[in-house]
Amino acid sequence: MASSISHRKTRDEYKKEKELDEARKAGNAPAELDEEGKEINPHIPEYILKAPWYLNANKPSLKHQRGVTKKEMDKGWYLRGATTGEAATKFRKGACENCGAMTHKTKDCCERPRKLGAKFTNDDIKPDEVIQKLELDYDSKRDPYNGYDPSSYKEVMDIYEKADTERKKKKLQELIKQHGGGGDKKTPDVDETLSKELMDNEEKEGSYDSETVAPIQKLDQKSRTTIRNLRIREDTAKYLYNLDVNSAFYEPKSRSMRDNPLPNANPNDIKFAGDNFARTSGETKEFRDLQRFAWEAQEKGQDVDISSAPSQAALLHADFLRKKEQLKQQTRNQLLTKYGGEEHLLKQEEIDKVPQSEIYTEYSSSGKLIKGEEKIVKSKYEEDVFLNNHKSIWGSYWENGQWGFACCRQLIKNAYCTGEKGKLLREKQLQQQQQHHIQQENQQDDDDNNTTTTTTTTTTSLLEQHLNKSNEDNDKHNKKEGKRKDKKERKEKEEKLKKALKDQDEENKKSVEKDERNIKYNSLSADDYNVSEEQMEAYNLKRKRSDDPMANFKDDSD
């Protein structure tokens, strides 16, 4: 079945092979064996079981499907300083000219360069090194500690141990000086106490707990930067906030957790709400609104682009929002004027918060003050109390030494509010009182003068009539003269303006005909340097305005 047969199979051979395969699959015949004597599964497809033609496999096998066995690599390292035997006595041809060894050339020699090499002196010829051929794998070649001798580190440990013993001796001498033990004689008890104290000090210096973190940070400026850059051990990593196996919030490649890992938890208790929280903070909402406005404007045919003209887009968006707010306010005002109900939209006054105080006060169950200072009353009168439907408090109005209400100007405390009508009635009442008072004074004056002026009334009245008539005639004459003068001045002014306009036209024509470089300088030393009002008005009427949009307008319809 799986063997590569050189000759062509006959029909009967092919039929027998198929029947044998069916029997093996049904378990009626034993399974086929490979080169190593292992059974081959009869259910393996033929395209997997057949070996390629270039392998020349004469027997059924699955060897071509198995992985290539890895060659066993050396795990050791090169022997350091190993030699093959004794050194030569004479220089050999092809050896190193410096040391005389045959295993390397002169340029690769690791010996100290000699003034005269072994080639010329035949002295101190070095033995040949052992050349090893190690087949190292990928990891062995790149292992930095491959071939390292751990016993060589003992020298470093000895140096540190010597330094530690010297430090302990010095510390012990300082403790002896502190305890006043300057003499050479020492008791064993003193030595034990001092050594115990020395051990305690070393344990305290080596310990590092949460209580000593703050003092360590204030040691010097060099240690501050190091400690600040270290991550606090109490910090929780992002991926530890959500340990649900079925969730896909945390992305290890970018080390980001965009969504909230605990959506069902209380927002006040969550310390981390996802990386998307930062994207919706700050001015991101304003930028999103601006981008939406630009897209909608482009759909409607307006040229608005944030990338090419951000300032223009921002100004257009601000103008759009302002007009939108105006339109909204306009419709609101129209609805309120039509249907009313503005009083229901007013916000309630905020309740004043109780101010905090450090004064200790204690009250009894009945509400009586036991400890603390009593509150000083600002006024003996009740504040903000509106009596009898008044809109203002009692004492908001003052008139003739009496207090009253400012809303209706009532001077009686128990009176009900009469509103604006009460104000009008009060004003009328005051006017009537004033008129009545004036009439009484006039009547008293008339009664006093009636007796003295009865005889001279007729003569004085005729004289007054004559004087009044003459004064009226003079006033009429003066009015006519004034009108005549005004008319004359108006005519003179119109004539002067016409003359000034004519002169200005001539001057404009001259300035057009002449070259600008030949125009003389208008000096104030000329005779007619004083400009009149008519000349100034003519100049303003005839002056060309370049900024006027209708200056060059021509009507082509005629």
From Swiss-Prot:
In alphabetical order, the GO MF annotations are: pre-mRNA 3'-splice site binding; zinc ion binding
Query: What segment(s) does the record annotate as region Disordered?
Result: 1-41, 428-532, 539-558
Identification of the protein by name: Pre-mRNA-splicing factor slu7
One Gene Ontology BP term is: mRNA splicing, via spliceosome
Q: Which residues form a coiled coil?
A: 474-514
**GO CC, alphabetical:** spliceosomal complex
Presence of the UniProt keyword Nucleus in the record: yes
Q: What is its main location?
A: nucleus
Low complexity composition-biased segments? 430-442, 450-465
Tell me the domain of life.
Answer: Eukaryota
Basic and acidic residues composition bias: which ranges? Answer: 10-25, 466-478, 489-519, 545-558
